[in-house]
């Protein structure tokens, strides 16, 4: 959601399946927003469908911003299989993949069984504090890491 505030004046098109992100992005004239369709997961506030996955096969993204509920040595993890499937497809179809993850996502014990991306596919990591070397090694050597404190996005 904080990233949406940063994107509020950029002349681009943002495609999302997140209801909350779409609503936040609509507060400004720019950017143009496309909400992917399908069923609504009311608990997690996103949309999903098989048609969405097919639609994504025909799109190439300049950049994909993805989130996570947990980071493990083998990947970016989320709590729902539909969310994972959409994120995987977007990662496949993107020229650049940007992961947004606070440091606690590396140490959480939350159950997040579905992999949405391989860590080697991540080009940029946006996080809140410098990573310990053991976590930095999860990613490819040339990853760009941007540290953003929460209040820097306001």
Residue ranges and their predicted role:
Residues 2-8:
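Glycine-rich beta-alpha loop segments
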Residues 9-14, 121-124:
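Short active-site oxyanion
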Residues 14-15, 79:
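Conserved SAM-binding loop
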Residues 22-154:
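Conserved phosphate- and dinucleotide-binding cores of soluble alpha/beta proteins
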């Amino acid at each position: 959601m904080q990233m949406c505030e940063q994107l509020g004046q950029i002349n681009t098109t943002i495609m999302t399946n997140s209801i909350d992100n779409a609503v936040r992005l609509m507060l400004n004239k720019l950017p143009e927003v496309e909400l992917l369709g399908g069923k609504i997961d009311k608990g997690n506030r996103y949309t999903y469908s098989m048609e969405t996955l097919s639609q994504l096969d025909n799109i190439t993204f300049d950049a994909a911003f993805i989130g996570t509920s947990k980071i493990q040595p083998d990947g970016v993890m989320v709590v729902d299989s539909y969310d994972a499937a959409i994120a995987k497809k977007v990662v496949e179809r993107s020229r650049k993949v940007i992961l947004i993850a606070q440091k606690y996502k590396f140490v959480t014990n939350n159950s997040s069984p579905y992999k949405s991306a391989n860590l080697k596919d991540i080009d940029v990591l946006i996080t809140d504090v410098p990573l310990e070397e053991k976590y930095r090694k999860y990613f490819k050597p040339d990853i760009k890491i941007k540290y953003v404190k929460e209040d820097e996005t306001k």
